[in-house]
Amino acid sequence: RLGGLRPGQSLAVDPLTAATLFESQVASRLLDHTARWLRADGHGYYTIGSAGHESNAAVALALRPSDPALLHYRSGGFYVARASQVAGHDAVGDVLRGMLARTTDPISGGRHKVFGHRALNVIPQTSTIASHLPRAVGLAQWGARDAGRGDVVVCSFGDASLNHSTAQGALNWAQHTAHRGDPVPVLFVCEDNGLGISVPSPEGWVADRVGRMGMEVESVEGDDPAEVLAATSRLSGHVREQRRPALLHLCCVRYLGHAGSDAEAAYRTTSDVRADYERDPIVGAGRLLVDAGECAGTDLVEWYLSQRVEIRERALALLSEPEFESATQVMAPLAAPDEARVATHATAFHGSGRGGSLE
């Protein structure tokens, strides 16, 4: 579909932003395909991807790189786009190392493929459903004490997670805090692909539920990147200025099933799967570039294929980096803290005048 794009009338996004968005989305999609390619050859350990959710890259570009992010596990697009805002950061290398469980993985040391990096202000999450929402609310309250920073905490999650008691408790906490008049600058992003692994969300459920939450809410289609950028800008501006929570309902699709082992054909019809390909966020981003006269659809296809080769070559090169050799290495961070190490870290954090003693 990229190759068939022709110039249109949509010039709502400047060419540089459109190019960054497209590049971030493509990198994320190709990382997902690379994960399956590696697994088929006996390499790599993680195949849950972000394909179809890449519109979250537009959410990242509409925020500041200093805004703390606690992300859904399908947030590859966001992670790559956030890295594009920080000079010299290698998001593709980060994700590949996690995928391959290399000890050089910068966030988990090869223990789990998870989105996170201190330099990007992306806080890593566990795989426990909705467990990061309370953390996001708490972080927003804590950060709001420094009114001069004006940070917005962004927290993304899936439509099925919305039904989890942990999510409901966190959303209620945010609303309750705002109702008291206390600042809680958090932007929730519900990435709604209509499926909780193999269980479909009832049609209209998410829209109805978030519409009753008593906070500022906007709903956008993920294959309309100009509107995702605009809606995120509006909502983040509201949160930043009013110090109150808001929610972006991001309607998207899911490609490649839940994970590599998922037999999607067992619970979805062929026509449903095909219909999703009419809502591809990458085609939406590519349309922005073609409409701006920056390139033709065939140019985008050629570039996409060249990037596929490059990312696969990088993945193969990373196979030479070290893996864990023992369970002891894997569990090392769980070991009881050594008193001398604790004292050293405390001194380094607080300075020589504080925290240097455990007495």
Ranges and model annotations:
Residues G4, H238-E359:
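Glycine/aspartate-rich loop-and-adjacent alpha/beta segment that forms the canonical ThDP
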Residues L30-H33, A40-V184, I197-A207, G211-G214:
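Cofactor-binding active-site loop characterized by glycine-rich and histidine/acidic residues
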Residues A147-R149, P202-R234, E278-L305:
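Conserved thiamine diphosphate
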Residues L11, Y46-G49, T128, A160, ...:
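Hydrophobic alpha-helical scaffolding
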Residues T47, L70, L187-V189, S219, ...:
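Structured core elements
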Residues A170-A174, A230-G237:
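Glycine-rich, charged/polar anion/phosphate-binding loops
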Residues D182, L187-D192:
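Catalytic or ion-translocation cores adjacent to nucleophile or general acid/base/metal-coordination motifs
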Residues R1-G44, L288-D291:
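Cofactor-/ligand-binding subdomain signature composed of acidic, glycine-rich
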